[in-house]
Amino acid sequence: MSDTLAQLADVLAARRHADPESSYVAKLHAKGLNKILEKVGEEATETLLAAKDAEHGDDATRQAVVAETADLWFHSLVMLSHLDIDHQAVLDELARRFGVSGLDEKAARQSR
């Protein structure tokens, strides 16, 4: 998984400063963080709706969850790129949480 994310991050970095007329990623960056966040929110909502439909759905509705989640991850990576946060920081944070009870991890965050 991280190889695919690394490849995508490289493509996003290359397209960040491309011509907004020829690159969707460059166009998002040119429109600024608020537009990127709008897209992340939109894709999050679409993912939630697809998941709700898929709960008792068929393979097509389950595939819609996969497609919408891919859109959400993509736009989240664009957001990270815009903020100059390497996707590896997120992967490192997930790795750090392995072996830690979810309840303990949540309690530690709340005590900060």
UniProtKB/Swiss-Prot annotation:
Keywords annotated in UniProt: Amino-acid biosynthesis, ATP-binding, Cytoplasm, Histidine biosynthesis, Hydrolase, Nucleotide-binding
Location, primary (coarse class): cytoplasm
Subcellular location(s) per record: Cytoplasm
Keyword Signal tagged: no
UniProt EC number: 3.6.1.31
Gene Ontology CC: one annotated term: cytoplasm
Molecular-function GO term, any one: ATP binding
Xref: SUPFAM superfamilies: all-alpha NTP pyrophosphatases
Enzyme class label: hydrolase
Catalytically driven reaction(s): 1-(5-phospho-beta-D-ribosyl)-ATP + H2O = 1-(5-phospho-beta-D-ribosyl)-5'-AMP + diphosphate + H(+)
PANTHER family in the record: HISTIDINE BIOSYNTHESIS BIFUNCTIONAL PROTEIN, HISTIDINE BIOSYNTHESIS BIFUNCTIONAL PROTEIN HISIE
Family membership: Belongs to the PRA-PH family.
NCBIfam families: histidine_hisI (TIGR03188), PRK00400.1-3 (NF001611)
Protein name listed in UniProt: Phosphoribosyl-ATP pyrophosphatase
Encoding gene (name): hisE
